[in-house]
Amino acid sequence: MTSETSDLLAPLDLAFWHIDSDLHPMHLGALGVFSAHSPTAGAHAADLLAARAAGVPGLRMRIRDVWQPLLPLAFGGATRETAPDFDPLDHVRLHAPTSDFHAEAGRLMERSLERGRPPWEAHVLPGEDGTSFAVLFKFHHALADGLRALTLAAGVMDPLDLPKPRPRPEQPTAGLFPDVRKLPGLVRGALSDVGRALDIGASVARSGLDNLSNRSSAALVAEPTGTRRTAGVAVDLDDVHRVRKTVGGTVNDVLIAVVAGALRRWLDERGDGTEGVAPRALIPVSKRRPRTAHPQGNRLSGYLMRLPVDDPDPLRRLARVRTAMDRNKDAGPGRGAGAVALLADHVPPLGHRFGGPLVKQAARLWFDILVTSVPLPSLGLRLGGNPLTEVYPFAPLAQGQSLAVAISTYRGQVHFGLVADAEAVPDLDRFAAALTAEVETLVAACAL
C-alpha cells in the first residue's frame, strides 16, 4: 500500500472532518476568474477539468473511517484512500451563464461536500457576455489546506514549462497496522504529548483571560443559518508596497490594518458604532516542514490579535497592528490562543470524533474573525489557453461568526475573498467597498 493510495489523516485534518456540519461546512474555496477567448471557453474548460482530474492522484482521494485495534492510541481515526469508483463528472459541473460570479459562488459555498466521495468540487460559471468565465473550486479542509488546495488546483491547469524538481527520497509507509514492537515508544510519545498539550492549553487559557476586558461587535456574531454570501475585492499590490515602504512593517501588516480600517468604516456606516471595539482576529500560520517526502496534512497554528477598529487614525492603526504582530512573532506560533490548533496533535482520534461538536461551538470564545493569507505563484496560470486574471480565496466560516476574510496576491494584485452568513451580513458589498476605500486612505495618508 503506497502513500498515494492510503494515508492516515493528521490530527488537525481529523478535527476538521468531525466538526463539519450542514450549517457550518468545513470546506475552503477559491474563485478563479479567466478571460475567455470565445463564448464556448467555459464549456471547454469544464471538459478539460474533468479530463485532467482523473490524472491528479490527490483528487481521487476519499476519506474513510478506520478502526485499528492494534493501535489503541489511533483507534477511531480516518484515512485518505483512492476511491475505486472515482468519476470526475461527479465533481466537475458546468452551470448556466451568469452575470454575477460571486452571487453564484455564495450559493454554491452553502452546500456541503458529499462525504462518501473525494471531498472536492469544481463549478464552471460562464459569463453572460462571453468574455470571461469563472471556476469555483471547493476542497474540504480535511483533504487540503490552502497550500495543498493550490497544488491540487494547479494540477488541472494548463502545464507550465518549469524546471523539474529534484527527486525526494522515498519513505516507507507505516500502513494501517503498524509494527506492534513500536507500541511502547508510541505510548511514551503519547505521554510526552500530554505534557506539551498542557503547556499549549495553559497558553490558550492565559490569552483568553487577557482578552476578556475588550469588546467585539455584535455584527461579527451570528446564529447558524447555513446561508452564505461571498464578495471579492482587487487592489493594486503597488499601493500596498508604497504604504509598507513609507511606514515599515510587512505586506501582511498593511493588509491586516486594511481589514481593521474597513471594519471601522463598515460598522460606522451600519450605525453599530466603533468606540471601544477591538475584535479578536485569528491569523493562521502554517507549520509545514519544507520538502518532506510524505504528506503532512494540515499543520497550522496561529496568531491572535486585537484589531484596532476603535482607533480613528489609519497610520496609528497600522502601527498598532505592527506592534501586535511583532509581539506574536517574538512569542512564536506555539503561544497564545492562536495556538489552539496545535492541541489537535495531542488529542486521540476518538476525542476528535466525539468532541468535535463541542470544539466548533467554542470557536467564538477564542476569536471573532478569521483573517488568513493564501500564497499564490507569480507565474501566469491558464486553463484551455484562457489566462487566469483574478483569484479570490474563501475560508470556512466558524460557528457563531458572521464573516471571514482570506487574502491572496497574484500578478500584481491583492485579492480579498469574503465569506459571510448571508442572513447576518446582507450588506457584504459595503464591507467590500470599505476595503478599497481603506487602501486609498492609507496611500493618501502616506503621501502627506
Q: What feature does the model see in each segment?
A:
Residues 1-12, 29-401, 405-448:
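Soluble acyl-CoA-dependent acyltransferase catalytic core bearing the H(X)4D motif
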